[in-house]
A protein has these predicted regions:
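A short alpha->beta transition loop at the rim of the catalytic pocket in nucleotide-sugar-dependent
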Residues: 383
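TRNA-recognition modules of translation machinery and tRNA-sensing kinases, especially anticodon-binding
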Residues: 1-363, 367, 392-422
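Short beta-alpha junctions and helix-cap segments that line functional grooves
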Residues: 374-376
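Interaction modules related to DNA damage response and DNA replication/repair
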Residues: 370-371
């Protein structure tokens, strides 16, 4: 990508929102645009980062034999009435955007249990087809009364939501545990240290829900965290009468070894049991030809929150001043940022074209109106993890590659540059 094509704006770092500096930088660059509170448009950097995260999510879900589908975002009231959730979501909790016209009443999907149940029951007619898990990645809508933190709590957002179908409770537990492992693999590949947080859902008999939290000072949630096991517990556990017994079952951890930390929820898994299958009268046939309800689970990952967490947890500070942010290499939209002095313009273009020919995504700062020093100062604005400077000391033999996160530098011969980035 030629930087001149991004048309980024000039930034005044004295005017940065220090609480959400990375997202505010993208706002001021024009790479994130707020149409209204909680409603955003996304530029090149955010969109490419989202696609890279999507790719990892899809790969891990597909490896686990999950099936990608797509449900409608505009959903008729009739299916929500079947689950008794229309009034809950439009009046009691007032979460769902909804409309009424000549065709009927509709809601903009905040979630998709109803669609998934109907879709699954229409296809999964026999116990022989179970277990099956469907997933989709797309936009969701929620009437957040207090939209805040840019993409930490917006009104429209992209998420992955999955829905599993099993024949009995035992197999539902197996799927739940399998999805736990899938999630841990996803977050590991993305580059986020995720904390599985046990949430008992009000009963002490077994794990029926689980959150995947990232520790960050910007998080609204407060969890109890054990560093040695990397396990978290919701503070609601403290209200349980036999809380010590419950906690001690979790790898022997103890309350007095846990600390309170701020965190943000990036994903969650729930065992739904037969709730939706029973309410909506959706069944499969068992070995004896009898109709039986599906045991279901639902699983969600918020892509916008993941991106917000990544860039806010990787702010680049030099000389006690915010300079930008650095995106982890695995998911970075552009792996390397090339800047050059005028005398090395041809060499820089040659490097840029070589990298692109080998499918290595990179940025070249081709803005001829800026001197080299100003170009270097702008490198961290777009989150690129690696920097190559072709300045006056460049010898046309070796490239000096700087890791913007650590400051470490590698010297790589020209002929080895492609292998370095692979």
């Amino acid at each position: 990508m030629k930087l001149s094509k991004l048309n980024i704006k000039k930034i005044n770092f004295n005017d940065i929102d220090i609480n959400y500096s990375s997202q505010d930088i993208l706002m001021k660059l024009g790479e994130l645009y707020q149409f209204e509170s909680g409603i955003y448009g996304y530029g090149n950097i955010w969109t490419k980062l989202e696609r890279n995260i999507e790719k990892i999510i899809i790969e891990e879900l597909d490896k686990a034999d999950c099936i990608q589908v797509e449900f409608p975002k505009l959903q008729p009231r009739s299916i929500w009435d079947k689950s008794n959730r229309w009034n809950q979501y439009t009046e009691e909790n007032d979460i769902m955007f909804h409309i009424k016209n000549n065709f009927g009443e509709y809601g903009l999907a905040p979630t998709a249990e109803e669609c998934a149940t109907i879709f699954g029951a229409n296809r999964l007619l026999s116990y022989k087809q179970l277990p099956t898990t469907y997933y989709q990645i797309g936009e969701k809508f929620r009437k957040e009364i207090r939209a805040r933190g840019y993409l930490f709590r917006p009104r429209t957002f992209v998420m992955m939501d999955a829905y599993s179908f099993d024949k009995d409770e035992e197999n539902m537990h197996k799927t739940f545990n399998k999805m736990h492992n899938v999630y841990m693999n996803i977050f590991k590949r993305i580059g986020i240290n995720i904390v599985p947080v046990i949430s008992d859902g009000g009963t002490m008999g077994g794990r029926v829900s689980e959150e995947f939290q990232a520790i960050t000072k910007l998080g609204e949630d407060i969890i109890l965290y054990d560093k040695n096991t990397n396990i978290g517990i919701n503070k609601e556990v403290l209200s349980f009468k036999d809380k010590e017994t419950f906690i001690n079952k979790l790898n022997g951890i103890s309350l007095n070894k846990m600390e309170e930390v701020n965190s943000v929820e990036l994903g969650n898994n729930f065992e739904l049991g037969t709730k939706y299958s029973d309410l909506m009268e959706m069944y499969y046939q068992d070995e004896n030809g009898n109709n039986k309800p599906f045991y279901m689970g639902c699983y969600g990952i918020g892509l916008g929150r993941i991106i917000a967490t990544i860039i806010e947890n990787n702010v680049l500070i030099k000389d006690e001043k915010i300079k930008g942010f650095v995106i982890p290499y695995n998911v970075a939209p552009y792996k390397v940022h090339i800047v050059y002095s005028e005398q090395n313009k041809d060499n820089a273009i040659e490097l840029y074209e070589r990298l692109l020919e080998n499918n290595i995504q990179c940025i070249i700062d081709d803005r001829d109106n800026l001197i080299l020093g100003n170009k270097i100062n702008d490198v961290a604005l777009l989150g690129t993890p690696k920097l190559i400077v072709l300045g006056n000391k460049y010898d046309n033999i070796n490239y000096e590659i700087e890791d913007l996160k650590t400051g470490e530098k590698d010297i790589v011969k020209k002929e080895n540059i492609i292998n370095y980035f692979r």
